């Protein structure tokens, strides 16, 4: 099914998983990753709306789970970033723990978009997030954000290495795609994956 993402609108912000809408109605895809990994920017690029989600250069700015509705019953979930360095260890891991709870409990979750800064890939909490998703058979699509920050040659080499490392690490194929809001890398692939999941 092909969705019209440019009409996506803000639905609600909630502080916890138990506050989310009834999971028996509709389908969801969640955007997760470290603080400042580009989750909000990716949603804005996907929907062709520069201000749909608040983008901040300050890590840890988002502290609520933000829901956006593509069409009735079709939702994108923007989770706060995990691992913000200036937080205590407990707070650094807090949103990762919430995401793991969400993965286990949310029956209408169709897939996980994991944002990873291509310059700092597969950090500890990213690895644990992927493992949690795979353990409950939730597909993962990894977007290597900020790909415009490195040269094209380095981009190709780095992308291949990340794909190889993830295959060895998780013993399965994880979809990986370079992504850049500035140079429009990966937006078409993101739409394709979402349309496949949300049908």
From Swiss-Prot:
Required cofactor(s): Mg(2+)
Entry's Gene Ontology BP terms: division septum assembly
Claim: DNA-binding is one of the keywords in the record: no
SUPFAM superfamilies: P-loop containing nucleoside triphosphate hydrolases
Residues involved in Mg(2+) binding: 40, 62
GO molecular function, one term: metal ion binding
Signal peptide: none
Occurrences of domain EngB-type G (ranges): 25-199
One cellular component term from this protein's GO annotations in UniProt: cytosol
UniProt function note: Necessary for normal cell division and for the maintenance of normal septation.
HAMAP family xref list: GTPase_EngB
Family, as annotated: Belongs to the TRAFAC class TrmE-Era-EngA-EngB-Septin-like GTPase superfamily. EngB GTPase family.
Protein name: Probable GTP-binding protein EngB
Organism, scientific name: Blochmanniella pennsylvanica (strain BPEN)
Gene name as annotated: engB
């Amino acid at each position: 099914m092909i969705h019209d993402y440019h009409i996506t609108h803000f639905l609600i912000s909630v502080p916890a998983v138990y506050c989310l809408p009834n999971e028996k109605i509709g389908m969801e895809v969640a955007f997760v990753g470290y603080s400042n990994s580009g989750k909000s920017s990716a949603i804005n690029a996907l929907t062709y709306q520069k201000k749909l989600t608040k983008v901040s250069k300050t890590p840890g700015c988002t502290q609520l789970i933000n829901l956006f509705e593509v069409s009735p019953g079709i939702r994108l979930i923007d989770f706060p970033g995990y691992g913000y360095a200036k937080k205590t260890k407990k707070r650094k891991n807090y949103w990762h723990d919430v995401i793991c709870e969400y993965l286990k409990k949310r029956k209408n979750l169709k897939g996980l978009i994991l944002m990873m800064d291509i310059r700092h890939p597969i950090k500890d909490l990213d690895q644990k997030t992927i493992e949690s998703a795979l353990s409950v058979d939730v597909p993962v699509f990894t977007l290597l954000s900020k790909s415009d920050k490195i040269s094209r040659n380095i981009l190709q080499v780095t992308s291949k290495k990340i794909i190889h490392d993830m295959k060895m690490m998780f013993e399965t194929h994880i979809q990986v795609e370079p992504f850049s809001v500035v140079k429009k890398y990966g937006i078409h692939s993101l739409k394709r994956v979402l349309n496949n999941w949300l049908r």
